[in-house]
Amino acid sequence: MIIKSSNYAVSAVREDQYPKDNLPEIALSGRSNVGKSSLINTLLNRKNLARTSSQPGKTQTLNFYLINDEFYLVDVPGYGYARVSQKKRQEFGEMIQDYLETRPNLKGLVILIDSRHEPTKDDIAMYNYAQYLNLPILVVCTKIDKIKKSQVNKVMSRLKKNIDLNYDYVTVLTFSSVTKLHVAELGNWIEEKISK
């Protein structure tokens, strides 16, 4: 996928704030601080389009980025952030659920999982939920550059132990924003989904 243009479009917390142009969308989800903003910036070859932060819980809205005037990448608030109040977490959950369940132009979900850790209960719940919605899923194991090469197979077997990867619409990639590992494959997956 060749990126010709990429721009922040809009932030939304409810349906009437979503873009109205019916372009296809790919959503990105994962726990707080898993590297969603870094992945967006790396994929789009932009330094600060999506704001990165060492503070988890920064993204609190659905952030829509218009790519090539053809589709949107949608940055979903990170889940599992302990310092957000129970009420706020519930609001995030409802906002994400409304978006995933009601958005007809949603063509796929990228679930980011930190390759240094076991998938969390929230990661597994999001994966199962996307399966339930029959969404094409790309599981991206982020920060793979922080893992020794000899340990990469261990990361994959740990993932398979925790998540049922025998789903027809799932693809798994390792990824690094530092070394740019599998950036092209990520772009190809997105391109394939938005063209269907």
UniProtKB/Swiss-Prot annotation:
| GTP-binding as UniProt keyword | yes
**Where does this protein hold Mg(2+)?**
37, 59
A Pfam family in this protein?
MMR_HSR1
Q: Give the record's GO biological process terms.
A: division septum assembly
Q: Domain EngB-type G: where?
A: 22-196
Q: Which PROSITE patterns does UniProt cross-reference here?
A: G_ENGB (PS51706)
Cofactor names from the entry are: Mg(2+)
Q: Which family does it belong to?
A: Belongs to the TRAFAC class TrmE-Era-EngA-EngB-Septin-like GTPase superfamily. EngB GTPase family.
For this entry, the protein name equals Probable GTP-binding protein EngB
